[in-house]
């Protein structure tokens, strides 16, 4: 997929850069593989705002994506590649030999007519094929990686994302993630071959604020431009720096304050993503 620019007949089109989706399927999704999606506007069951700056946006239908890929040793044929408004990656509709249909994350270089298969044994190292990490060749580029066997893929699922299998150790696979983190994952966890589709997503430019509103994101206001009743940084005569270390609207330290508690799974992280920055 290429990027698309426009002849600037309006100011917002001057900066606009979007992904050219002309090669994608133009019809509606398979109804049996969709669910309704209700917007919350950032409100909880009491009607109170729990996530600020969310609301509006185009109505969406949720596509049910098969992240688990547990339909073993049944070959599937890719019918088409589709757009999905709920994620940055494209999705692929797969027709299995037994008549079942499913949506999967579309990796790069997967096209209509291609064959894909998932197995608990070693299979061909081709984009879209899924197998346990213990059978994937070291050095392979992978996506949709499970963190617990049977839980479904959690790592490397967004547009252009991938992880690299860099080694094995005592039944564990060593992965290098895009963030620079190296971590251990059990060898029986499934992963799909290839990098996720739509790598050009990183290069888009919305060109105007309204395009962000179409996605359901409302304008984001800084605390220093508010009144004292609305934010600890608010008030003052003229422009101020806030007068204190950065805090949230509820007075808790932010911007660099560490909030992550140590987890038992920290032992799976061999190299932190923060080490790269030093």
Curated annotation (Swiss-Prot):
SUPFAM superfamilies recorded: Nucleic acid-binding proteins (SSF50249), Translation proteins SH3-like domain (SSF50104)
Gene Ontology terms: biological process: cytoplasmic translation
Location of the region described as Disordered in the Swiss-Prot/TrEMBL record: 202-278
Keywords: Ribonucleoprotein, Ribosomal protein, RNA-binding, rRNA-binding
Gene Ontology cellular-component terms listed: large ribosomal subunit
UniProt-recorded Gene Ontology molecular function terms: rRNA binding; structural constituent of ribosome; transferase activity
SMART domains: Ribosomal_L2, Ribosomal_L2_C
Matching Gene3D superfamilies: 2.30.30.30, Nucleic acid-binding proteins (2.40.50.140), Ribosomal protein L2, domain 3 (4.10.950.10)
Family the UniProt entry places it in: Belongs to the universal ribosomal protein uL2 family.
Function (record text): One of the primary rRNA binding proteins. Required for association of the 30S and 50S subunits to form the 70S ribosome, for tRNA binding and peptide bond formation. It has been suggested to have peptidyltransferase activity; this is somewhat controversial. Makes several contacts with the 16S rRNA in the 70S ribosome.
Quaternary structure and interacting proteins, as annotated: Part of the 50S ribosomal subunit. Forms a bridge to the 30S subunit in the 70S ribosome.
PANTHER family for the chain: LARGE RIBOSOMAL SUBUNIT PROTEIN UL2M (PTHR13691:SF5), RIBOSOMAL PROTEIN L2 (PTHR13691)
Protein name: Large ribosomal subunit protein uL2
Species the sequence originates in: Rhizobium leguminosarum bv. trifolii (strain WSM2304)
Gene: rplB
């Amino acid at each position: 997929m290429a990027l698309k620019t426009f002849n600037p007949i309006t100011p917002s089109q001057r900066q606009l850069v979007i992904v050219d989706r002309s090669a994608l399927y133009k019809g509606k999704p398979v109804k049996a593989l969709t669910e309704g999606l209700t917007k919350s506007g950032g409100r909880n069951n009491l009607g109170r705002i729990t996530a600020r700056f969310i609301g509006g946006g185009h109505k969406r239908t949720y596509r049910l994506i098969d992240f688990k890929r547990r339909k073993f040793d049944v070959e599937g044929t890719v019918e088409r590649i589709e757009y999905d408004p709920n994620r940055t990656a494209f999705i692929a509709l797969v027709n299995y030999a037994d008549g079942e249909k499913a949506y999967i994350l579309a990796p790069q270089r997967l096209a209509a007519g291609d064959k894909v298969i998932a197995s608990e044994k070693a299979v061909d190292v081709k984009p879209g094929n899924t197998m346990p990490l213990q059978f994937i060749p070291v050095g392979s580029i992978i996506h949709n990686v499970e963190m617990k066997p049977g839980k479904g893929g959690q790592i490397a699922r967004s547009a252009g994302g991938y992880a690299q299998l860099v080694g094995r150790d005592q039944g564990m696979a060593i992965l290098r993630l895009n963030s620079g983190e190296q971590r251990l994952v059990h060898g029986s966890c499934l992963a799909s071959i290839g990098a996720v589709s739509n790598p050009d997503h990183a290069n888009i430019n919305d060109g105007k604020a309204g395009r962000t509103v179409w996605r359901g994101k409302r304008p984001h206001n800084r605390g220093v431009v508010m009144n004292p009743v609305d934010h600890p940084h608010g008030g003052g005569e003229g422009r101020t720096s806030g007068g204190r270390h950065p805090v949230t609207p509820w007075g808790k330290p932010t911007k660099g304050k560490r909030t992550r508690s140590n987890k038992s799974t920290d032992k799976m992280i061999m190299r932190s993503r923060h080490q790269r920055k030093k």
